[in-house]
Amino acid sequence: MNLRLLAIGKITNSKYISIFDHYLKNIIVINKRVGITNFEIVEINKSNDKNTNSRKEKEYEVLVKKINLPDSINILLDEKGKSFTTKEFKSMLEKYLNEPKSEINFIIGGPDGSSNSLKKIADETISLSKMTLPHLMARVFLMEQLYRSLSILINHPYHRD
């Protein structure tokens, strides 16, 4: 199973990069122990279109080409999505890791949100918080929760009840 994070925009702030890379390295160390053969980060350039809806649609068109739709589970992050506790998030991830698909995609739209087309291909829409998070903070927060969930799955002491 491949686990992928697809995001509109690139991390350019060194403080975010440092924290993001910390969790990325930790995930790579343990991913094979839970059946993840590859962990990939896919960054899509933001569209320069002036119209918000057109911009989101253009970003979707680039992003969807990076997804193997028939053989993937697509989890969209959206502030209106379902909220999870850490244990519920771990259970969702564990469920999808046992599906007969080749990849799980966590998708973060651009700063203006996600197009309706992107929302339609999502198998699940989740929210990391009831609060609005900055785009880059959402990425870091997702990476931490992925690492935490994977740690729970292998009984690593990172997560404490």
Residue spans for each PLM region:
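Conserved RecA-like P-loop NTPase ATPase core
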Residues: L5, I75, G109, L142
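S-adenosyl-L-methionine/SAH cofactor-binding core of RNA-modifying enzymes
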Residues: I36-E103
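N-terminal beta1-alpha1 ligand-phosphate binding loop
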Residues: M1-N31
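A structural signal for isolated positions on well-ordered beta-strands in alpha/beta enzyme cores
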Residues: N2-L6, E40-V42, N105
